[in-house]
Amino acid sequence: MSEIVSINITNHQLVLDPPFPASWDPQPRTKFPVTIVRVRDSDGREGVGSGDVMYGFADYARYFIGQPAGDLDRHAAVLANIDFHAGRPWPLDLALWDLAGKTAGKPVWEMLG
């Protein structure tokens, strides 16, 4: 099984034009912060995920680098702990699933059942 060799995280501002009037916010949003995560394995495959902004993840990358890329149960347990302490690491979860799907040659929806 391949191992995770790198995690690349970039943060972006998605411009909303026209502004988006979210039902929970009285001010229309003109931009939305997002994160794109790229996870690369030792076989050169890359999984990509995106979602809510992920600040401060660098301290936690060591819990994934060198680990089996396809061990999704393990990764989910680590992500649940990170979520409790640091918040919103779910773009990484999506990238890990994307990588697992590419490794298996299946779409993620099929792997989920």
Show which residues each predicted segment covers.
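Metal- or metallocofactor-binding catalytic centers and their adjacent structured scaffolds
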Residues: 6, 38-107
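Structured beta-strand/loop patches that form or line metal/cofactor-binding pockets in enzymes
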Residues: 1-47
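Short, intrinsically disordered, charge-balanced linker/junction segments flanking boundaries
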Residues: 109-113
